[in-house]
């Protein structure tokens, strides 16, 4: 079983902002695999389903970004999911819009949501999918909580489909195969 987590902030104010790439990715995965994310629990919203024969839990923590680890660890503990089967999807300002990077482990790289997950799991060793949102052109907070331009939004729609394919590959063929196939791919 896999726990697929998309990071973001709850509420209409944050919908489709750069910082909510994880939520958008989870919604895209859910739509493709007919998984309803309508259950309340684990300090978030989640849904259970199947991706290519593998059981998955899709989770959107509603703790706000900086406390995401609380939600992740609750779900992981409840379902007894190993860290290697927790996939976290989130925005990355060091990657251009339209680029993704998959990692098996690593530091938080300044991302507060990841910092909190590392803290709660007591480990940096969980796979993640970083989705490029571009370098800030203004104040960091305003930038990540801002929406994409119309041109960027077109790329993001495409990248969300690629993220879905990457997660499918991670679940079925393993993280290393997904890294080989999707890292370096740019729209």
UniProtKB/Swiss-Prot annotation:
The record marks 9 as: Discriminates between blocked and unblocked aminoacyl-tRNA. Hydrolyzes ribosome-free peptidyl-tRNAs (with 1 or more amino acids incorporated), which drop off the ribosome during protein synthesis, or as a result of ribosome stalling. Keywords: Cytoplasm, Hydrolase, RNA-binding, tRNA-binding. Its EC number is 3.1.1.29. This is Peptidyl-tRNA hydrolase. The active site is at 19 (proton acceptor). The record marks 91 as: Stabilizes the basic form of H active site to accept a proton. It is an enzyme of class 3 (hydrolase). InterPro entries: Pept_tRNA_hydro, Pept_tRNA_hydro_CS, Pept_tRNA_hydro_sf. It catalyses: an N-acyl-L-alpha-aminoacyl-tRNA + H2O = an N-acyl-L-amino acid + a tRNA + H(+). The lineage of its organism: Bacteria, Bacillati, Bacillota, Clostridia, Eubacteriales. Belongs to the PTH family. GO terms for cellular component: cytoplasm. Monomer. TRNA binds at residues 14, 64, 66, 112. PANTHER family: PEPTIDYL-TRNA HYDROLASE. It is found in: Cytoplasm. GO terms for molecular function: peptidyl-tRNA hydrolase activity; tRNA binding. SUPFAM superfamilies: Peptidyl-tRNA hydrolase-like (SSF53178). GO terms for biological process: protein quality control for misfolded or incompletely synthesized proteins; rescue of stalled ribosome. Pfam families: Pept_tRNA_hydro. It comes from Clostridium acetobutylicum (strain ATCC 824 / DSM 792 / JCM 1419 / IAM 19013 / LMG 5710 / NBRC 13948 / NRRL B-527 / VKM B-1787 / 2291 / W).
């Amino acid at each position: 079983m896999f726990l697929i987590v998309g990071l973001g902030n709850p509420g209409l104010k944050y919908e489709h902002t750069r910082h909510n790439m994880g939520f958008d990715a989870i919604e895209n995965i859910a739509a493709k695999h007919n998984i309803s994310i309508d259950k309340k629990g684990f300090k978030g919203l989640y849904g259970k389903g199947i991706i290519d024969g593998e059981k998955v839990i899709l989770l959107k923590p509603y703790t706000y970004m900086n406390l995401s680890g609380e939600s992740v660890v609750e779900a992981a503990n409840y379902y007894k999911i190993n860290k290697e089967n927790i996939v976290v999807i989130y925005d990355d300002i060091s990657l251009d819009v339209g680029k993704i990077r998959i990692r098996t482990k690593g530091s938080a790289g300044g991302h507060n949501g990841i910092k909190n997950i590392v803290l709660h799991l007591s480990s940096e060793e969980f796979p993640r999918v970083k989705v490029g949102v571009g370098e800030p052109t203004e104040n960091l907070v305003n930038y990540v909580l801002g929406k994409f331009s119309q041109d960027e939004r077109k790329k993001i729609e495409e990248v969300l489909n690629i993220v879905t394919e990457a997660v499918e590959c991670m679940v079925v063929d393993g993280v290393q195969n997904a890294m080989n196939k999707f890292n370096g791919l740019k729209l």
